[in-house]
């Protein structure tokens, strides 16, 4: 399954394009722009599993740095600051990674 099976390619392109500048990433705006906020909980979990590159059941800090690439392969990497901000927003239990339920909450709060 690919991201475009769940989200519109044009929405992905616009959302990724809106955050090309370093340190401009805002996960709340991004999730809204890409259309993820409007998706069912099941679809949000499918997106989570696409972003969980090592299939560990979590999106670790290293994977978060590549989150935009999960939506569009030619997108930029997040900066260290952006990655840490995203991790802090999503890691509700403080274990240093984001699980599927935490990701769903992060999207719902966007």
From Swiss-Prot:
The keyword Metal-binding applies. GO terms for biological process: excitatory chemical synaptic transmission; gene expression; inhibitory chemical synaptic transmission. The keyword Chloroplast does not apply. It comes from the Eukaryota. Ca(2+) 1 binds at residues 52, 54, 56, 58, 60, 63. The modification N-acetylserine is found at residue 2. The modification Phosphoserine is found at residues 2, 24. GO terms for cellular component: axon; cytoplasm; synapse. SUPFAM superfamilies: EF-hand. Residues 39-74, 78-110 form the EF-hand domain. Keywords: Acetylation, Calcium, Metal-binding, Muscle protein, Phosphoprotein, Repeat. Belongs to the parvalbumin family. AB domain, comprising of helices A and B, is involved in structural stabilization, protecting the hydrophobic core of the protein. It is required for high-affinity binding of Ca(2+) and for Mg(2+)-binding. In muscle, parvalbumin is thought to be involved in relaxation after contraction. It binds two calcium ions. This is Parvalbumin alpha. It comes from Bos taurus (Bovine). The lineage of its organism: Eukaryota, Metazoa, Chordata, Craniata, Vertebrata.
